[in-house]
Structures are given as structure tokens and as C-alpha cells.
């Protein structure tokens, strides 16, 4: 019975990684749709969101089934409750990719305001944080999880930098206000993606060490 449970947990990890990979791809596609002004890609990415939602529900149901059926001890129980929280964060990241695509569709109907430089940097950093947070989860690596928490400051700083630059555009030319606000939304969405990756990392520390580090300096 224990061997069967171990196999079930291994399969669950694989499904969570698959969902994480899909979400990472959704974020990447949303930024590509923005930078390359590809509205077809934006619409296609929005249509793919149902896969993220379906996988989130299926994984959540599997976690509940395993808790009820296997009645896991402390360590495995923390793993399963952490997994349930992680897939919720992943689903919300998918929603943020959809939000980004919706703003991209609006921006693609207007002349470009400026070249996108910091937005792709934010996206790269947020995707890296997500990948490392999931690696930390699978490998039970609390130190890597703490690194993800620290990396969140970089994305926060970029978001502030983008906002300051956009304010300058709006002050100098009121005609840019609508476009600048839409870009600022996208910057905020990416900051929130990084925040969700940080949430996952914090939960990994709890899973591994039984310590809650939210609102603490890692």
C-alpha cells in the first residue's frame, strides 16, 4: 500500500509540473503577443486558459482523494495541502496571462507608445521564479525556495521603474494616458505573477521545514 501511495504522489508531482509548464508558456505567449503586436496569438492564448482551469480542478480533486483515502502522516499531509495551494496560485497566474492578452489586444489597436524593454525583463524574471519555485517543490529544496523569495524584490523594482517612466509619458503628452495605463496594468500583472511564485516558494519552506515564513525576511 505504501508503494502505491508513493507512486500516486510521484504522478501528482508530474501533473503539477505539467500545469506549471503550461502556465509558464501562457505567460510567455502573452508577452510575445504584446511585444510582437500579435493579436491572433493573444486570442489563442486566451482560448487555452480552459486547459489551465481544468488541470487545476483535476489536481485539486486528486489531492482531496489522496487525503481521504490514504490518511497521510504529517510530512505527506503537508505535501498534499501545499500542492492544493500551489495549483491555486498557478491557476491565478494563468488568469493574469489572460489579462495581459486582453490589454495587448487593446494596445495592438493603437500606435505603439514605446519599445518594450523592462516588461520582457519582468516576464523573464517571473517565469524563472516560477520554474525555480516548482523545482524547489519537487526536490524539497528550502534554500532554492528562499532564493525565489529574495528574487521578488527585483521584479518589484522593475515594476516601479516602469510606472515612473509611464508617468513621465502621461505628464508630457496627455494623449498617451490610455496606452500608458494599459501598459502599467501589464507591469502590475507580471509583478503579481512573481508574487504568486513567491507564495509557492513560501509554501515549499513550510512543506519542508514546517515553518511559516510569510511576512518574514527569508
Where on the chain are the PLM-derived regions?
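Cytosolic, long alpha-helical scaffolding segments
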Residues: 1-218
